[in-house]
Amino acid sequence: MANPVTEIDVDLNTQEVLLAASQHDTAKLRRLLRANDAAGNPANVKDPETGYSPLHAAIAACEPDEEEDVKSNGVQTNGDRQTHGQESTVEAAVQTVKLLLQEGAIWNDLDLNNETPGCIARRLGLTELYDMVVDAGVRAELLLNRLDGYEQLSDEEMEEDGEQEQEQQDAAVAADASITNTAEDESVPQLVDTTAAAPPQTADAEPSVTSSRYLNSDLTFQQDRLLDQDQNGVMMAWESDIMAKSAKQLLPTPGLRVLNVGHGMGIVDGFIQEQSPSAHHIIEAHPAVVAEMKRKGWHEKPGVVIHEGKWQDILPGLVAEGVMFDAIYYDTFAESYADFREFFTEQVIGVLEQEGKWSFFNGMGADRQISYDVYQKVVEMDLFEAGFDVEWEEIDVPKLEGEWNGVRRPYWSIDKYRLPLCKYMD
């Protein structure tokens, strides 16, 4: 039987940590974190009423009281929060956030309002704090990437198995702690956790989106969307403007040779055709999509070559044949970031001309702005390491109210799409 006194002590310890974080009392917070002998990382305790972690609390405490944010004439101010007597508070918060991240605070833990600490910082206009959380997320993903134990960067990142994720986090903490420099004469581990542990899977839990499940899934082709058997949106018509601009960026003149990996609804391939390529190769892995392509006569279009299968199996053959392209587009479904990174680190160099360009559908983390910002930096660094420069063009995303009716979950919720255009480094 649980000891009620112990339970009260644990709750009081949690509240002490949260209070010290919200008051930006780094000295007390450091003592509490180091002295805590409860199970789990005290930097990630949760307030049961708000779901706040210490990181949430430290950032949320920077929000001005309403009466402090209203001018004497009663007009609400809309300027930068940091210019209204908040400088000292924000500076204290910076030091608190720094400490918490060093102690292993989870950068994208969710509160009961479905906000991460970075979401709160962005909502309050706290740019410096937001950037700190973004950088922490980048460090976490890059480290887990190098450990070959990171989760896939996809729409499912918030819902990975909790036990597996915790093992990844523990391994990352141990690895990172061994290389952390001392600061202020105290050795502290830097952030490596990526998400809060998800609840255990139940018998009726939603199935994971994996490549093998998708490729064995029945598909539903509708006028404005393509869905798998679990009602996941594989591709939707609202992406058309993005695809049109991508095709024009990749194929500025007629007569170029292009490869598209992932046909889906055929949106980008339709726009590619409008650019009059001399050769248009398409790799498509799903048998139902291939059948739909043939039904629509894609195999009869001039210059079009359909490769049935996964790019992992098709591309080595094209390399062996010496087939080269001036442009490549990548837009697969249910593949992991590890697959994508293998594509541009191992495969692109074998089929892309020296002056060629390539792009991809940039939807990683698009369910919230901070995830999108983190994953953009991650892929940018990995592209650089693979020998590619990348330029980004921001495109307005149309209002998507009503678009998600009948779809398992929205995979896009931010206002701007960042279109990548990659080429070999000079």
From Swiss-Prot:
Location in or out of the cell: Cytoplasm; Nucleus
Domain RMT2: 207-426
Keyword Methyltransferase among record annotations: yes
Disulfide bond residue pairs: none
Any one GO BP annotation for this protein: methylation
GO molecular function annotations of the record: protein arginine N5-methyltransferase activity
Compositional bias annotation for Polar residues: 73-88
Protein family per UniProt: Belongs to the class I-like SAM-binding methyltransferase superfamily. RMT2 methyltransferase family.
Function noted in UniProt: S-adenosyl-L-methionine-dependent protein-arginine N-methyltransferase that methylates the delta-nitrogen atom of arginine residues to form N5-methylarginine (type IV) in target proteins. Monomethylates ribosomal protein L12.
Protein's name in the database: Protein arginine N-methyltransferase 2
